[in-house]
Every structure is written in structure tokens, then in C-alpha cells.
Amino acid sequence: KENINFFDFIKIDIQGAELDVFRGGAESLKNVLTIITEVEFVQLYNDQPLFGDMSSFLSKFHIMFHKFLSLQGRTLKPTILNNDLNHSSQHMWSDAMYIRDVEKISSLNNHQILKLSVLGYLYGSPDLTFHCLKFYDKKNNTQLTSILKN
């Protein structure tokens, strides 16, 4: 057994069983900063939890939905446009980015604030990065936000 106290970042895609993993590893969610997980909007597998189920569960750990990274879908059967089954008029799944609730940022230590800022930057969320750095600057009397203004 490994002695890992907490994770900063989780990326998971296991064909509809993501919520089962989070339920089984709920203790690991108490300190996670960012989660990238596949979510579905329509059931692709039997008894599969959907986006709302995932968001509701994660919110219990002060983890909020931030954005979709890649909406994916299929054409509605039996309509097939231009012989293309992948014509995605019906959004069916996406990778979703969840983050530590920004309203609770004061509960994070300095390292966590900076890590969340970097994760926001890496996943194309400059507003999240700026928010974290602005809070960090105020807390530590620094000027890290100035690097984003140039």
C-alpha cells in the first residue's frame, strides 16, 4: 500500500465508471485541486451516472464544474446526414474540468493556490489563473498577477 496523502490532479476516463471510482476513493477528493473526467449527457452504458450526477457528487467535496474541454456526440438515429454517423448534433459526452470551489480559495495553502493557478493556465483558463494569482498576491503581498498583464 502506497502512502499517498492527497492528489492535486486527477485525470480519468474509464467508460462510465468514473463516479464509482470517486465514491470508492472519496477520501482522496478532500484535497484535489483539479479533475478532468469524461462525463455523459445520455446513457451509453447500463445504469451509467450522467453529468448531473457527477457534478452533484463532487460538489459535496467543494469541487465545482469549471468547463467542458471537448463536446462529442453522434447523429440522432435514424437520421444520418451525408452518410456520416458521427455528425454530432446530439451532444452525448465530453471531458469536463472540475476545480476546487473558487469561493473556498481561502482554505487553500500557498502551494495549492499556485498549483491551481498553473492547472488553470495549462487547461486554457486564464481567468482562473488570474483569480488564483490575485488572491495569492493579496495574501502574500506579492505581484505575480503582473506577469499576466504583460
Q: Where are the model-predicted features located?
A:
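Short amphipathic alpha-helix with an adjacent loop that forms part of the alpha/beta core around
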Residues: 1-3
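Conserved acidic-Pro-Pro-aromatic motif
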Residues: 5-132, 136-137
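Boundary/linker segments of alpha-helical solenoid repeat arrays
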Residues: 140-149
